[in-house]
Curated annotation (Swiss-Prot):
One GO location term (cellular component): chloroplast
Source organism (scientific name): Thalassiosira pseudonana (Marine diatom)
Residue span(s) of domain HTH lysR-type: 5-62
DNA-binding region: 22-41
Main subcellular location of this protein, as a coarse class: plastid
Stated name of the protein: Probable RuBisCO transcriptional regulator
UniProt keyword list: Chloroplast, DNA-binding, Plastid, Transcription, Transcription regulation
InterPro entries hit by this protein: LysR_subst-bd, Tscrpt_reg_HTH_LysR, WH-like_DNA-bd_sf, WH_DNA-bd_sf
SUPFAM superfamilies, alphabetized: Periplasmic binding protein-like II, Winged helix' DNA-binding domain
Pfam hit, one: LysR_substrate
Family: Belongs to the LysR transcriptional regulatory family.
Annotated function: Trans-acting transcriptional regulator of RuBisCO genes (rbcL and rbcS) expression.
Record GO biological process: regulation of DNA-templated transcription
Gene name as annotated: rbcR-A
Length: 307
C-alpha cells in the first residue's frame, strides 16, 4: 500500500496547526512558504479532504484536520522513538531524554535534580519542557516527552494512557514578611480567624495551585471568598518579592522558598490544625520505549527522593 502522505508533509501540517500561520511554520522548518503551501495542497489532494480552513489571516483546522493532526503527532512521535531505540542500542550510556515538569516543579525542584543527574551522566543530553500539568501530561501521553514530574491534577481523559506514580509530598506553606506582626506570634502559629485579617497575594485564580489551596481551606470550613486578596500575580518570584517587601501574605510551595529562608527575608507561619500538602507524581507512557537514558533518570529520581 502506498501511503498518501510523507513524513515531511506530516511535519509541515503539524507545524502549521501549531503556529496557525504558513509564514511562521515555514520559518521553523526552514522551507519557503510557496513550497510549504504546495506540500499542503498535495497532501489534501491525495487524502481527498480539506484539512485547513483559510479565512483571511486565520488558519483553522477542519474536523478532518483535527483527527489527522492526532494521528500525525502519534506517527511522528513513533518515528522519533524508533530512532531513539536504535541509537540506544548503538550508544550504550549515551543518549537523549525529553523531560517535562509542571511550572513550580520546573522552576524550583527540577533544576536540582537535573544538576545532580548531569554530574552522574554528563554524556546524556536532556531536553526540558516546563508547562502546565495538563499540557505536560498530554505530551507524555502522545510520546513527545519521555517522563515528567507534575504537581497538579492530571485530566481524567489522559490517565488511561499514562502510568502515574506518587513521588514526593510537597507542602504548601503560608509566608509573611519578617516585619509582619504575626511574625512575632509565639511558635509562629495563627488561628483560622486570623486568616481573614491578612492581605493576600495569590497566583492567578485559574492556576492549579491556587485552586488546590482554595479547596483544602474550604474543606476546613474557611471561607476563602472572604479573604482580602490585594494582588494576583502570575509569577512565584514576584509573589515572594512582594511578601518580603511587606505587601501581604501568600501560600507557596516549600520548595520555592529555600533561598528566602536562608536570607531570612520571609517568615513561615502555620495555621492551627491545618497542613496543606499535595503529592507530586512521576508520569510516563507505559507503551513508550524505555531507553537506558530513561532508566538512569528514572532510577536517579527515586534515589534523590530517599536522600
Amino acid at each position: 500500500m502506498v501511503l498518501p502522505f510523507t513524513l515531511q508533509q506530516l511535519r509541515i501540517f503539524k507545524a502549521i496547526a501549531s503556529e496557525k500561520s504558513f509564514t511562521q511554520a515555514a520559518e521553523i522548518l526552514f522551507v519557503s512558504q510557496p513550497s510549504l503551501s504546495k506540500q499542503i495542497k498535495t497532501l489534501e489532494n491525495r487524502l481527498g479532504i480539506l484539512l485547513l480552513n483559510r479565512t483571511g489571516n486565520k488558519i483553522l483546522l477542519t474536523e478532518a484536520g483535527v483527527v489527522f493532526l492526532q494521528y500525525s503527532e502519534r506517527i511522528l512521535a513513533l518515528c522519533e522513538e524508533s530512532c531513539r531505540a536504535l541509537n540506544d542500542l548503538k550508544d550504550g550510556e549515551r543518549g537523549n531524554l525529553k523531560v517535562g515538569a509542571s511550572q513550580t516543579i520546573g522552576a524550583y525542584l527540577m533544576p536540582r535534580v537535573l544538576t545532580l543527574f548531569a554530574q552522574s551522566y554528563p554524556q546524556i543530553n536532556l531536553h526540558i519542557d516546563i508547562d502546565s500539568t495538563r499540557i505536560i501530561a498530554k505530551k507524555v501521553a502522545d510520546r513527545s516527552l519521555d517522563i515528567a514530574v507534575v504537581g497538579g491534577d492530571i485530566p481524567t481523559g489522559l490517565k488511561k494512557n499514562l502510568e502515574i506514580e506518587d513521588f514526593v509530598e510537597d507542602e504548601l506553606i503560608l509566608i509573611i514578611s519578617k516585619s509582619h506582626p504575626f511574625a512575632k506570634k509565639k511558635k509562629k502559629k495563627i488561628s483560622k480567624e486570623d486568616l481573614y485579617h491578612l492581605n493576600f497575594i495569590t497566583l492567578n485564580s485559574n492556576s492549579t495551585i491556587h485552586k488546590f489551596i482554595n479547596n483544602i481551606l474550604i474543606q476546613n470550613n474557611i471561607q476563602t471568598a472572604q479573604f482580602n486578596v490585594i494582588m494576583e500575580l502570575n509569577s512565584i518570584e514576584a509573589i515572594k518579592t512582594a511578601v518580603s517587601l511587606g505587601l501581604g501574605a501568600a501560600f507557596v510551595s516549600s520548595s520555592a522558598i529555600e533561598k528566602e529562608l536562608e536570607l531570612k527575608t520571609v517568615e513561615i507561619i502555620t495555621i492551627e490544625n491545618i497542613r496543606i500538602t499535595r503529592t507530586l507524581s512521576i508520569i510516563t507512557n507505559p507503551d513508550s520505549h524505555r531507553s537506558k537514558a530513561f532508566d538512569f533518570f528514572y532510577n536517579e529520581l527515586w534515589l534523590l527522593k530517599n536522600l
